[in-house]
Design a protein with these regions (language model features):
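N-terminal helix-loop segment corresponding to the beta1-alpha1 unit
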Residues: 1-167, 172
Length: 175
């Protein structure tokens, strides 16, 4: 978040990001602090119209919007690519999910451990004869975040060269 941008992390009111407490005292872990350095946090309750209005207003002012809801959730909230790009045609909008926006697993939640197992990464780690072993670190999450970063940068260059905003679909399994 130190690339000279204004970054916001929208979280649930009263709960925040689950990553905040990993290996920490419950307030902020070192991992959370490293990943979220220089970001400004805001709590928005998308279950209420005012929360959706605030989120939409932020999206309309943004150059890039990245969300990680299950497919269809942002659309039901009026915050999907079609709605935001109608208000801000140049938006670069990235969906980051476990399994992509369509396909047989699209509606299922996904996280690092599931992606590692389904991608076969766990079969490649550990010792011969042992059951599948989780790779150290959240490799699927990291791969998806690096892929999202690269795709967003390419989309911003495309837009700067006279193109339009873009809709990006990133998922943990394919990353």
């Amino acid at each position: 978040a130190t690339l000279r941008g204004d970054f916001r992390d929208d979280s649930r009111p009263g709960r925040g990001d689950d990553f905040r407490a990993i290996r920490g005292d419950g307030s902020m872990s070192a991992a959370f602090a490293a990943v979220n350095r220089s970001k400004r946090g805001i709590a928005v309750d998308l279950a209420h119209p005012e929360g959706r209005r605030v989120a939409f207003a932020l999206g309309r002012r943004a150059d890039v919007l990245i969300e990680n809801f299950l497919p269809g959730v942002a659309e039901r909230q009026g915050l999907g690519y079609a709605a935001v790009s109608a208000a801000k045609p140049g938006i670069v909008y990235a969906y980051v999910t476990g399994f992509g926006q369509d396909g047989p697993l699209a509606r299922r939640p996904g996280y690092n451990l599931i992606a590692q197992g389904m991608a076969g990464i766990m079969a490649l780690t550990g010792h011969p004869g042992d059951p599948p072993t989780r790779a150290g670190g959240s490799i699927s999450d990291l791969a998806a975040s690096f892929l999202t970063f690269g795709m967003v940068q390419a989309a911003l260059v495309h837009r700067a060269r006279g193109g339009r905003g873009q809709h990006l679909d990133v998922n943990l399994l394919a990353s």
